[in-house]
Amino acid sequence: MDKRIFLCVGGDSRQFYMSCALNEMGRVYSYGSDLSGGSVIPLAEIGDMHEKADVLVLPIIKGSGLEIGCSGGKKVFCTELSDHLKKSALVTGGRLNIRMIEYFSALGYDVADYFKREELAIKNCIPTAEGALQIAMNETGITIFGSRVLITGYGRTAKACANLFKGAGAQCAVAVRRSAAAAEAQNNGLEAFDFKELYGHIPRFDIIINTVPAMIFDRRLLKAAAKDTLFIDLASVPGGIDFEAARELNKRVVQALSLPGKVAPITSGKIIAETVKDILLERGK
């Protein structure tokens, strides 16, 4: 089989490192990045690409339109990219909006959102947890060892955080809704209690990490927290903390979104590349 031709567009540094990781699978063109190196072929203009791609890899999309953010504040539109794709091309990206999905699907392209893939979510837990640990070390005046840490939820990210903070010597507890999750946490050496009991427990924690994408910490709970408690919200927008109330109460809150790309862009890029490879293998491309 001939080597695949990839067109990687826009994004931050992890998109560049993803491009580098895809090199072993074929020839890789990069457009809209201010980074260069390795065997990745940089394109100053999209029209400089004189062959059509088998795979278009878009970054994590933030808007609701057809534009893709590039370095230097520039943008490229999906309508500019479709002419550079083979008819059988795969189009993949992160958090693809409905307009992009409909646009490429209408042209007959196979479309896949790598951000919805289970393997990417599992692998991203580690850099997310390490990012939370880094924030806790930078934003508090205490050691992680001996600190009292509360984690809300006990899904993949919460488990990774609990393992990491516990390994650093923190006294970790988790707030959960299901008794099965509480039992699992207790089996792993963690204190566990129900969300309904949060109000009574919250004053004793130095660091509180939220992983639940629903409102948890309202004004009442924020007010009950100790003065110097650090809140780290890892949940996707809109998060689980009343940020306006937190500001009014002078609470320390860090909304930590997209941590893998910020704290470990090389690893994050490799994870995306591995996920793209999985998609290609599954779809026989």
PLM region spans:
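Residues in the short beta-alpha loop(s) of Rossmann-like NAD(P)-binding domains
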Residues: 12, 34-35, 97, 177-179, ...
